[in-house]
């Protein structure tokens, strides 16, 4: 049979192709409804445990032990709040954040938001490229440069899934998350951290953030956890569920979507905390406080833990994390293009464009700075994401707090106050970092 590349946008990666594609029967039991609503949160959670998170958490754990563990927890709770606003916005209005921004802002402002959203997607994909390339390097022995080139072939995965239903995509993502989680569970069992010290790291210590280096890492953790493109992504994919347009159905959908978000991001929190705990217990505790590269962590795990299993699981989990953007990056790219520009292109082309734009800085960085600088490039990509975050947060909080737009589903005042406080905190941290850099 002759095969030809698709010339139109195709499911399951394009929002217009999968909107209202998962039916939720009104007479279904609460557990059945919850099971049907689980999925969008999983797609979002993948971005919360990507290689960028690994780089920041490994450096934070090796340099400062468990001291920045509370930042991981606070960043994850912040993500739960913001992603819940996204699902509320999408369900209440029937439109995603990109569509609403196009409708409610002047064309020049909306176009600027689109460019920033695209930049955040490329920055995210840069982290995935570097992470997957590192995994190929560690597991197969190829050079990191060769690994970067190999990541270009993930477009074939998008082609293989063309026409698949959305639940199949969510099942694949769940498999990736389960793989990552299982690997780190075994890692922690092998290492055996001292849990009272871990618990002490959960207590906020603002003095820790008073100097530039821990603040830089804290902002990197925040940028690696709460990603701008996830805000656009979540407000769109939550609309794949069909539960009715009446107020009662929307209220139920918001409640179940909130549970999906909290549950999925709790899994991501456990993975991110496990990475930092792993680095703190294995490296900081043994005096290796300068482990800032993922490949260094991989090679050190073997002699420190006393077996090849720990390092193999580490590399395998990294590969699973690196491949995750094949799905979420493609969907997010289509969301912002359809929402801001009303443009549709074949999903394999969208994937090729995003990956191509990420490959260029990845190759330049590796060839110019050397393969040993991959970890620094990963952390930098996460800081860039944090600097862009306020530009996506502003419209999200503003729209979800607008009673004229949201009706009875408008944010409670305390939620809006908390969200705006978070916006101010992130902006202040970013400005402080810029002052350290250029002041």
UniProtKB/Swiss-Prot annotation:
Membrane topology classification: Multi-pass membrane protein
Keyword Transmembrane helix annotated:
yes
> Known Pfam families for this protein?
Nramp (PF01566)
UniProt entry tagged with the keyword Acyltransferase: no
Instruction: Tell me a Gene Ontology molecular-function term this record carries.
Output: symporter activity
Top-level division of the source organism's lineage:
Bacteria
Main location as per UniProt: membrane
* Membrane-crossing residue ranges in chain numbering: 64-84, 139-161, 171-191, 214-234, 262-282, 300-320, 359-379, 380-400, 418-438
Family of the protein in this entry: Belongs to the NRAMP family.
Q: What does this protein do?
A: H(+)-stimulated, divalent metal cation uptake system.
Name of the protein in question: Divalent metal cation transporter MntH 1
Query: Which species is the source of this protein?
Result: Pseudomonas aeruginosa (strain ATCC 15692 / DSM 22644 / CIP 104116 / JCM 14847 / LMG 12228 / 1C / PRS 101 / PAO1)
